[in-house]
Amino acid sequence: LKRYMALLWLAFFVVLSAAATTVQAHAGLVGSQPKDGEVLQVNPGQISLRFTETLEPDLIAIHLYDWNGEEIRLDRPTLQPGDATQVNAQLPELKEGTYVAIVSVVSEDGHPVEERLSFSIGHKSAAVADPTEKKQDSGYLIVYRYLTQGIILLGGGLYVLAWRGQRCGLPAFSQFLGVGRQIGWGLALVGLVFLWFLYDEALTAVSLTEALCLGNWSVLMQSPFAMMLLVSFALLILLAIPNMITGWYVVLWLALVGLQAFGGHAWGTQPVWLSLILRLLHVLTVSVWMGALVYLLLTFRHAKGNERFKTFFLRTVAITSGLAVLTGLVMLFVQTDAILILQSSMTWSYLLYGKVVAVCGMLAIAYRQTMSWRKGNDLRAKLLRWELILGFVAILAGLWMSQTNYPTAAAAKAETVSIQHQQ
């Protein structure tokens, strides 16, 4: 076990040394022309907005409203030639008064982002109606993503542990879950469908459902999150094929679990290859770690006195928990730094604190249980349940973090601009 941990620490420092310092969060507005709140003497002719990262032309929408809240039709926005971080929209003839522009874009990591700015021509209007468009509430998306991806992560980890545990004389996957397999599969499938429509609704620039029906893959492939949902759906269908060899299901489960790493912040962090590898390892190890705990709880009686399984279980949990913690730490160094986290008042930072507390609690309980088990004592089911509860809290915090901006220099600048917009 000491050799495994030594290799893990070596890998940690090697990967950390390769980490780049240039990172991004979700696309954030860092500048505009005209400036927010500016009073112009004449029509500027176009609106220009600059973001913290490159944008996809098919996933941009700009809506302009006058002081009465009436929408003014604009031509399709275009990217600045040679600079994909800037989007421009030509303005028609405009009367004197105040106008509000709502800009909807999609980050490199697939998250929808909405920004607003106002400007006036000639003079500010005495009263300005609030445009009808509102920012999308991501609460439902977080809940459905937690439930759906939680089922997938636990299902994959459970199957891998049951596959190995069966060699130690413990029940097979189908034996201890029974009809629960079909229920979990159905819930995951329905959850993916709900996630698709919730995500599609959050995109104002394009309809992914329409693009899917028309076979417009050039648009679909611009959204990593949409592609993750589609491929996950296909893999779940393949998992339903009966009477295949065990290796078929093992490979599909690992692919399905690993795929969940490709729908978050990874695409917005440079270098992308390192970010994807870290997230892939993190998701896979968390899946096996949590799956091992659930498997032990479900086969509690069968595991008693089984020394072969105990050795396998302790080694598996030690390696996966160590890798999960190490990859999580490296991702922090790649994405941001401790000073920015401590100085930030962003939701992401508070979620990180909660995740750290939950993981530390899991490790403390695991250490106590391991020491007791090694001495020949029985495991305590109550402590095992608490360890699982803390694990579910950590997963929820992690998924929520993937839906929110994390603190970086660029994100801090965007946050400052956003505050200025509100003043």
Where are these regions (language model features)?
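Bacterial N-terminal signal peptides that target proteins for export
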Residues: 1-8
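C-terminal segment of classical bacterial N-terminal signal peptides
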Residues: 14-22, 403
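Detector for glycine-centered tight turns/loop "hinges" at secondary-structure junctions
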Residues: 37, 68-69, 110
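Short, surface-exposed alpha-helix to beta-strand junction/turn motifs within ectodomains of secreted
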Residues: 47-75
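Surface-exposed coil/turn segments at beta-strand junctions on protein surfaces, enriched
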Residues: 40-42, 80-82, 94-96
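Polytopic transmembrane helical bundles with strong interfacial aromatic enrichment
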Residues: 28, 57-63, 75, 84-96, ...
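Surface-exposed, proline-enriched loop/turn segments that connect beta strands in immunoglobulin-like
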Residues: 34-35, 74-76
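N-terminal edge beta-strand
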Residues: 24-43
